[in-house]
Curated annotation (Swiss-Prot):
InterPro entries: dsRBD_dom, RNase_III, RNase_III_dom, RNase_III_sf. The keyword Hydrolase applies. It comes from Paramecium bursaria Chlorella virus 1 (PBCV-1). The keyword Hydrolase applies. CDD domains: DSRM_RNAse_III_family, RIBOc. Belongs to the ribonuclease III family. One of its GO terms (biological process) is rRNA processing. Keywords: Endonuclease, Hydrolase, Nuclease, RNA-binding. This is Putative protein A464R. HAMAP family: RNase_III. Transmembrane segments: none annotated.
Length: 275
């Protein structure tokens, strides 16, 4: 097991700055590049991120700074220190509850199917990571230099987890009402609610349309798949042996949705039914 002196020599990194164990209560974060979302003033000046910086980030006073250090820790500063995984586990449930209650209260005339589809959008990695990036959470991720060289602090999956861990930290420190207040404020500030409200489950629309006009169930045929850092998928929609459309995306699911949307247009389905 590494002792503390070795950890100090190795250091750990927040943003692009190396820090060591002596900064266990204040950790260094980088100067914010103009291409990134604006962070707290201390982020832009390159000084320590402190309790006050976290309060600036979430918009309310905090009590226990250690919860937030844990929420932002992708790598432990020293052997045995907590990282965000357990906090993210709790934050995921806190976020799910807050979103479910928000949808229930704000859409009284909508059925369970609509609420479920909208909840799926709210908790999607794409949505949460985009909000995290706009907030500048990548500036707070505590990570070793190797990860930063590879851009892991802006990785959508990591940002999604860090956002959920932050929800967990606020819940543990300040309670469920504070966590709800933070999420609602963040939603109003960073989310494109108009786009979010669009029912974009084109695959479901296509399946309903083919049943309505008594056509065979569409087949979704994978034409091309490439994984790795830049994934790419191509899917054909085939009905009754005939190719109707082709869709592309960064996941098979996205490719199926895009192919379904094109198929609906190709089949002459009215725009109001598609959306």
């Amino acid at each position: 097991m590494e002792n503390i002196s070795k950890c100090m020599e190795r250091g750990t990194t927040v943003g692009t700055m190396m820090v060591s164990e002596r900064f266990k209560d204040q950790v260094q974060i980088p100067n914010t590049d103009d291409n990134f979302p604006e962070g707290p003033p201390s982020t832009k000046s390159g000084v320590m991120f402190t309790k006050e910086d976290v309060e600036y980030l979430i918009g309310m006073p905090i009590i226990d700074f250690s919860y937030y250090k844990t929420a932002f820790s992708y790598n432990a500063i020293v052997e045995g220190e907590a990282t965000y995984e357990r906090m993210e586990f709790v934050g995921d449930s806190v976020l799910g509850f807050i979103i479910a209650r928000y949808l229930y209260d704000n859409f009284p005339g909508k059925d369970e199917g609509f609420l479920s589809r909208l909840r799926t959008k709210f908790v999607s990695g794409k949505f949460l990571s985009s909000i995290a990036l706009r907030m500048g959470l990548h500036n707070y991720v505590i990570m070793h230099q190797k990860g930063l060289y590879r851009g892991w602090n802006t990785n959508p999956r990591i940002l999604e987890d860090v956002f959920e861990a932050l929800m967990g930290a606020i819940y543990f420190d300040l309670g469920i009402n504070a966590a709800k207040q933070f999420f609602m404020t963040t939603l109003a500030k960073y989310a494109d609610m108009q786009s979010l409200m669009l029912d974009t489950n084109y695959k479901d629309r296509l399946l309903k349309h083919t049943r309505k006009v008594e056509l065979p169930r569409p087949e979704f045929v994978s034409v091309f798949e490439k994984g790795g850092a830049n994934p790419s998928f191509i899917v054909d929609v085939v009905i009754n042996g005939q190719k109707i459309s082709t869709g592309t995306g960064k996941s098979r699911k996205d490719a199926e949705q895009n192919a379904s949307k094109i198929a609906l247009h190709t089949m002459g389905v009215p725009e109001e039914f598609i959306h």
